[in-house]
Every structure is written in C-alpha cells, then in structure tokens.
From Swiss-Prot:
It comes from Glycine max (Soybean). It comes from the Eukaryota. One of its GO terms (biological process) is response to desiccation. Belongs to the LEA type 2 family. Disulfide bonds: none annotated. This is Desiccation protectant protein Lea14 homolog.
Length: 152
C-alpha cells in the first residue's frame, strides 16, 4: 500500500512540475513624476497566462537597489488578475525619497542617471499548486528628473 501511495505522489509531482506556468518579464522602468517628498518611477511588467481561466495575483513585492543599497521597497497587495490565455501588463509604481537620491550623488555624476537593480516577486494563486512566486530581476539606468520635469 505504501509503495502505491509513493507512486501516486511521484506521478502527481511529475505532472505538476511539467505543467505550464505563467511567465513574466520587466519591459520598462521609467520616470513617472516628482512630488514634494519623493520621485516616482514606474516599472512595466508583462505577464503571460497559459491557462484558459483568469488567475488572481496575490501581491507584488519589489526592491529597488542602487550602488549596492536598497533605495525603495514595498508590497502591492491584490493588484488584480491575469487575463485568460493572454498577456497582462502590470504597472508597479516605485517611490524613492529625495533624501535617498541625494545620498547617491557619486553615482549620479555627469550623466544625471542612476544605475539600478529592480527585484520583483510576483505572487500568483495557481489552482492545485497554491501560491507560486515568479522572481524577476532587471538592471539598467534610470534618468533622474530635471527642473523642467518638476514644473511640468
């Protein structure tokens, strides 16, 4: 009996491993706006859903790093659902306080941008499997706002 149960567990584990899963990628990270206390950037995330039913997104966790330091992090609870058999674009707003940008003055230099690494964890609720996290990481450069951006 025990042997039969082990075979059943292995069969289910193999089928779950080979199931198609949603895939995601960061398509863009851009300046969005300036407020009195922070600069807001917007990360665009493309997520494809291979299933014929919508899948709820539980949360999005993010961490923005520059010069080896975490400059922003947070969680976006319940950002919606993935469209059935389609690609969904998600907007992830990231707020960076002005005080932290000032501490990155060495990295900013003459080109008025910062090198960044954006780490995202997209937590989705897959039927049968349960919560599943899609880890994403993107490196690049973000332009800092100019005076004209602040008064536009």
């Amino acid at each position: 009996m025990s042997q039969l149960l082990d075979k059943a567990k292995n069969y289910v584990a193999e089928k779950v491993t080979n199931m198609p899963k949603p895939e995601a990628s960061v398509t863009d990270v851009d300046f969005k706006r300036v407020s009195r206390d922070s600069v807001e950037y917007l990360a665009k995330v493309s997520v494809s859903n291979p299933y014929s039913t919508p899948i709820p997104i539980c949360e999005i966790k993010y961490s923005l790093k520059s010069a080896g330091k975490e400059i922003a992090s947070g969680t976006i609870p319940d950002p919606g659902s993935l469209k059935a058999s389609d690609t969904t674009m998600l907007d992830v707003p990231v707020k960076v306080p002005h005080s932290i940008l000032l501490s990155l003055a060495k990295d900013i230099g003459a080109d008025w941008d910062i090198d960044y690494q954006l780490d995202l964890g997209l937590v989705i609720d897959l039927p049968v499997i349960g919560n599943f996290t899609i880890p994403l990481s993107q490196k690049g450069e973000i332009k800092l706002p100019t005076l004209s951006d602040m008064f536009a």
